A protein has these predicted regions:
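GST-like domain detector, emphasizing the conserved glutathione-binding G-site
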Residues: 1-134, 155
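Short, solvent-exposed turn/loop segments enriched in Gly/Ser/Thr/Pro and often Arg
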Residues: 36, 164, 212
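Generic structural signal for individual residues within well-ordered alpha-helical segments
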Residues: 93-96, 168, 193, 206
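GST-like fold's C-terminal all-alpha helical module
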Residues: 104-198
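Substrate-binding/catalytic groove segments of enzymes
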Residues: 179, 206-207
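A late-sequence structural motif
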Residues: 202-203
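Terminal-tail/helix-coil boundary detector
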Residues: 207-213
Length: 213
């Protein structure tokens, strides 16, 4: 498919970054249109495309799609390039499991509590809430240990064949490990640490802070 691809998203959104990683790994050319869902006027306009006023939204020609997992599945199915969903049913199941774990149990403690309080808030000249960071780290440990077990299984998160799980986790880990406590927690898990050392060197990760326009 050759129609133009645009990601509508907020530059700080981890899920906008998930979508961008998938597009990059699929070798799809795309542009990013900055939309701030926290701005009331922009959020209201965004509801024309997303009834809940969230990001990201993918626009592919006349086709609009919201919800990150739907976007990444579409990107893998609609475009040529490396497969991001394994053919092996057990590997595909592990991929779906890892995504479900990090979305359901990892996003809030890893991103909203640890990263947002330890890294983002000080960068915005706000005080770090140490109690919130501690609570986030405690909850994150269970998530990281679950992901370590999935990585140890050897079907996904190897750093070799990239799947949609790498895209979801890559965006989360990029933020989480910017907090020293997050980086230390990952380093304590040998399989996950090995995966992250390889994943973080990929252009899809190293280019996240340079947003295409």
């Amino acid at each position: 498919m050759k129609a133009s691809v645009t990601i509508l998203g907020f530059r700080h959104s981890v899920y906008q970054r998930v979508a961008r990683i998938a597009l990059h790994e699929k070798n799809v050319e795309f542009r990013v249109k900055e939309v701030d869902p926290f701005d009331p006027e922009e959020a209201e306009r965004l509801r024309d495309l997303h009834p809940f006023g969230r990001v990201p939204v993918l626009r592919h020609g006349s086709f609009d799609l919201y919800e990150t997992s739907a976007i990444t599945r579409y990107v893998d199915a609609a475009f040529d390039g490396p497969r991001l969903v394994p053919e092996d049913p057990r590997a595909a199941a592990r991929m779906a499991q890892a995504i479900a774990v990090v979305d359901a149990y990892g996003y809030w403690p890893m991103i909203r509590q640890v990263f947002a309080r330890r890294v983002f808030a000080p960068n915005e000249d706000s005080a770090c809430n140490e109690a919130e960071v501690a609570r986030g780290l405690a909850a994150s440990r269970t998530v990281i240990e679950a992901l370590e077990a999935i990585a140890a299984d050897g079907r996904i998160l190897t750093g070799d064949a990239i799947t949609l799980a790498d895209c979801h986790l890559g965006a989360m880990m990029d933020y989480f490990t910017r907090a020293p406590e997050g980086a230390a927690l990952i380093q304590s898990q040998p399989h996950l640490d090995s995966w992250w050392r390889r994943m973080r060197a990929r252009p899809s990760i190293t280019g996240l802070d340079q947003q295409r326009r």
